[in-house]
Amino acid sequence: MTMQSEIAGSGPLRTVLLSTGALLLVVAVVVSPKDAFDASIQGLDIWWKIIFPAMLPFLMLSQMLTAFGFTHALGVLLGPLMQRWFRLPGKAGLAIAVGMCGGFPAGADTASRLAQDQQITAKQAGIVAAAAHFANPLMIILVIGAAFLHQPAAGYFLLIVHWVSGWIATMIGVRLLPVKSKNTRIVISSADLESNKVASDPKKLTSASHTASLKKRSLWSQMMLAARDAQERDGRGFGKLLGDTVSQAVQTLMMTGGYMIVFAVFVRLLTLYITPDTSVTFWPSLLELHLGTYHLSQSPLTPVLLISLLAAVLGWGGLCSLLQVSAVLKSAGLATTSMLYFAGVRLLHALVAFSISLLLWLPFSRYSSEVWTTFQTTSGNRLAPFLNKQSLVGMNTSDIIEAVWSGFPAAGVGLALLLTVMISLSGLTFWFNRRFSR
């Protein structure tokens, strides 16, 4: 969608506000070119040294797994968990796992791919994007924990709180704003229909042992049928698929980098002209995640309040991340009318994360001094560039990229473990439903 169509499709008030804001931003850049240039370099450094290498593999992986039919097969296994707790199709589970391991907007990108493949509806895509909106785990551990706070263990604490509070906020959000409505339907694959036909045939349910073996075969056949149908609908060879995934992933990351650079300049100019003589601590966190967490880490707050506010900022994600998700969904032809729901889930995420951190940080900090020492000793060589500086500007690019990529195998294993845990929870949910529904 082009900028001209965006402005033409908006109301007159919105057009005036956007045009006025753009004009004021241009004037401020012309008046203060050096500050704008330094801010753009700061945003570019964060994007190029952290976001790009950490997110590119997950964007490519999610698209390739969708094309190969993995998401369809996974949806069969995650169906009970997603439908029971999140009121979503099982195929949405991959988007949540990718968002947790890859960071935003990888989850929204996966949700848009699922909607384009007609695995979920447009409204469900917006809800899945809200459920899969997480900060990049490498950024939380390396940048916030190691570089900003000089405590890698604090980064792991923030990561766990970030994930747990995100799931809690999603479960609360889907119940405050239900997914199902007269305009929303759950997409059922041909494998699901085949399974329903088998289950509804009384002639095939002759004995308990035969029923158990039939259910096992039907589950496997349902997964294989879903994956085969997806591969046939896609029809691309591996070479073309690889080229398409690289092109689309880089395009998404370029959009992300553009937003980060613009907001870095915007925050710097607001600091110069709006709050020149005040301490800049809180309001950058409302606009951009990375700059906001940096300003918070430099503030003279008590440790418990600092960690709680950092957890809340990670849950909110910043206005920049909301615009990134909106752009990803709109580029896929999806309506962005659910962005109010998205913002509500982000506020819930921030509130839950703040509360959990406020309750758990003191016990964690009291009994984890040995854990901090272990982390700093075993990870000192790999994290030395981060522990010695509080800003990414001026750091050796090769050292940063090496540190990020050294964590990618762990992130890949983490993705596999997340899927395993989600499948196990789905199995427990299925057993619980059958056990207590009799």
Predicted regions and their residues:
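Core transmembrane alpha-helical segments of multi-pass membrane transporters/permeases
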Residues: 14-27, 43-68, 220-232, 244-270
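Structural signal for alpha-helical transmembrane segments and their membrane-water exit/capping regions
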Residues: 18-36, 59-69, 174, 231-232, ...
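Alpha-helical transmembrane segments
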Residues: 50-55, 155-170, 413-420
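Transmembrane helical segments that form the transport core of multi-pass membrane transport proteins
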Residues: 68-70, 242-318
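Alpha-helical membrane segments and immediately flanking helix-loop junctions
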Residues: 85-149, 283-299, 306-333, 344
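Alpha-helical transmembrane segments of multi-pass small-molecule/ion transporters
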Residues: 129-132, 138-225, 264, 324, ...
